[in-house]
Regions:
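Flexible phosphate-sensing "switch/lid" loops adjacent to ATP/NTP-binding sites
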Residues: 1-209
Length: 209
């Protein structure tokens, strides 16, 4: 589930609904049929400052960024109803955020990250990419920037894309928990080349499988 995605590369479900290609791939990986509720709001950019807004798989108009910022408050019921329906029908629903959960200039009206976790009563994990460098500063800074009500939704960190021996992290994860009160629940290895389309982009230079 991803409440809102921005991508030109939509996929079409069996009933003709458009959802983000990434959510379509994720559904197939989970062994379930992709459906509109898995990506209730899809933004398909038409220019640098405007997007076609697709709601529950159907186009609903083209809005500028400023117009969408105002309009998206009305999409909360759509998002929450879609998520509730999935939770009723599936044992586990994994919700993906977008970008950073601590973009403090965007928290007002954010319907895809921790405000969604708060509204739906979801425990949240913050995933940091150690391959990019600065993962501990990034995780600590994320929690430090969050208001108290959103910080309370964060139950743990996951460190992703580690190259080499996890023992090289030493006591850093424990130190991070002492500093901010959030445990590191897992460290995932770098898998090298993975033949899956990048999020929000379709590999157009690759022949179809």
């Amino acid at each position: 589930f991803k409440a809102q995605n921005m991508a030109l590369n939509a996929a079409v479900t069996v009933d003709g609904s458009e959802i983000g290609h990434a959510q379509w791939v994720q559904a197939l990986a989970a062994g379930v049929e992709p459906e509109a509720a898995m990506n209730p709001v899809l933004l398909k950019p038409t220019s640098d400052r405007a997007s076609q807004v697709v709601v529950l798989g159907r186009p609903s108009g083209v809005l500028s960024a400023a117009e969408y910022h105002q309009a998206k408050r009305s999409l909360w019921p759509v998002v929450l109803d879609a998520l509730a329906g999935l939770r009723d029908r599936f044992d586990v629903v994994l919700c993906e955020g977008a970008g950073s959960p601590a973009e403090i200039n965007l928290l007002d009206g954010d319907l895809v990250n921790l405000p969604l976790a708060r509204a739906a009563g979801l425990p949240a994990l913050v995933v940091g990419d150690i391959d990019r460098g600065g993962v501990f500063a990034s995780l600590y800074g994320t929690v430090a920037l969050l208001p108290d009500d959103l910080r309370a939704t964060v139950r743990g960190f996951v460190i992703n894309r580690l190259r080499g021996d996890p023992a090289l992290l030493g006591d850093a994860c424990a130190d991070l928990e002492r500093r901010c009160g959030v445990p590191t629940l897992g460290v995932l290895p770098h898998l090298g080349v993975v033949d899956i389309d990048n999020e929000d982009s379709l590999a157009l230079d690759r022949p179809p499988a």
